[in-house]
């Protein structure tokens, strides 16, 4: 009866509700104990959020299983989660959480997660923990975001040299950190102990232990452990987190034959949305992130849905995933951005939310001409984050072409023109703030030039910028909005071939075809393509230059800024006369110049799916790429000065180098980022621009991803 009443209360107002499973019933946990979990128990956590429309709610339902919880409790929590999901009409996104391997969404619910020894079977209940008498508790503080405070047995062997500990004896609270513990964990242990002190309203004293064998602490520790300090503390293991694997597979769960079967649909990601059908339940197993998604078709049977929501060992064996994998259950129509990013051109009717933009996978959404007001960037950080802009590009620009082991200045009259067979360094000096170095790699650049490019960029960073510049790697075709703004409103032009003359220009072909696309604030790229009709595209405008005359071809989907961009390109290339023709109204001479009429792309470009930015802390401690994803509600204080952080904004990657990051990480982070992009299963371009900068030199486009950025936070 208690369970039915609690389910009726679930999800009716915004906030977090938590229940512990006691004798197969839901028992609410007081808000003062949210974030504290007994390792012998299982819990349901429901987060309710109001829709932006104001008409209803959306829910994230987590069912958490402690490492020491019984099989009955684990089964009960899954069954009760399904009941709550049914009560909410299948609307929640469900997450199976295993102690120590919780999802980023779960970790984002609590500033600290505390694991308490015992459980309901041992008589432990969630009561106000502010008593100061008869206490003896040893807590290990480990991890980053959030910190995990785990009660451990009161033995000397529970200590390691890489973690921090809190010795709680009621009226006295002691903090000790191993010599290899990070600064971050040391500070968090102090904060955790200070929180215990505050709970006791001044009835406890806080002390710091510098050495386990000094005179002041020797007596206390002997009383606490029941024996003297053994003389040494063992080494601890690193808090290893997410390791990239290799496979991403899609399975179908169906009981159409009368027997529940799991069959492989595809192991070639990104998948097609058409691989899913409403009549069945599907499982997407991502071994690269140890994450399992269960997609519930709206017409799938309850048996199919329940089998995936409460999986047994055979389920994990069948899909070749570890038992500790994160598991997220999604209703049809309630797919998360991370799930949709593993499909090509997912079509959704749901509105976009958050800082993420709608980006296309291997496509580019065009933007009509608009006025860009750089003054709003400082007052509107979100705008800076969305636009990837630091200013309006009106500062000073200097460009060099990289030739083998040297760089050559590009004549100013050729600024904005690049050759696809070359590499370039663009140094931008804004009117305020640090310099920006774009190092641009043409798609046809030689291996020698591609190798020399980062070396010459590093040299430029030291000699021209005094070591004070953001460095942004750009591959042809992925130029970020700010780089597009550096050429006085003119198109960015990319020619075929490479530079072979001292003037910085290569001899042009007699017939040339330039594809013109509009992007941020109406700025255009004009890219030379082979002069064949098969390279036309109905979505764009084209400039065709021939010995007998020139044409601007206007595709049916071209916007005004693209037509103007084609005109501007003609002017830059000294083409004073041209004929403007619309698609399907071409003269014979036009097709003759292109080698005859043939098929070309005529379909409208599709928009991609909304993908919200993701923050990672990077590590190469094991020799493989390892990244810990920070909870989805990340804040500025999640940036760890001891580490290198990566913010994946989908079509742009930021790398933040903390002041205390070690030299090995600084030397290897580029390969770690490359591996991250290479192993991404979304199908997006592997040539995403990457911007690298030091702590304290963050661009507006980065800080705008953090609510209320504080420049003095680390002072």
UniProtKB/Swiss-Prot annotation:
Binding-site residues for Ca(2+) 1, renumbered to this chain? 421-422, 449, 499
Chain residue ranges for the region called Actin-binding, Ca-sensitive: 384-715
A single Gene Ontology CC term? actin cytoskeleton
Localization: Cytoplasm, Cytoskeleton
- Binding locations of Ca(2+) 3: 642, 665
Q: Sorted alphabetically, which keywords does the UniProt record give?
A: Actin capping, Actin-binding, Calcium, Cytoplasm, Cytoskeleton, Metal-binding, Repeat
SUPFAM superfamilies in UniProt = Actin depolymerizing proteins (SSF55753), C-terminal, gelsolin-like domain of Sec23/24 (SSF82754)
Where a 1,2-diacyl-sn-glycero-3-phospho-(1D-myo-inositol-4,5-bisphosphate) binds, per the record, is at: 136-145
In the record for this protein, the Gelsolin-like repeats are positioned at: 24-75, 147-187, 260-306, 405-451, 524-564, 625-667
Show the segment(s) annotated as Actin-actin interfilament contact point.
72-75
Upregulation: Interaction with actin is suppressed by PIP2.
Q: In which tissues is it expressed?
A: Predominantly in the body wall muscle, but expression is not restricted to muscle cells.
Which family does the UniProt entry place this protein in?
A: Belongs to the villin/gelsolin family.
Q: Which PANTHER family match?
A: GELSOLIN-LIKE DOMAIN-CONTAINING PROTEIN, VILLIN
Cited function? Calcium-regulated, actin-modulating protein that binds to the plus (or barbed) ends of actin monomers or filaments, preventing monomer exchange (end-blocking or capping). It can promote the assembly of monomers into filaments (nucleation) as well as sever filaments already formed.
This one is known as: Gelsolin, cytoplasmic
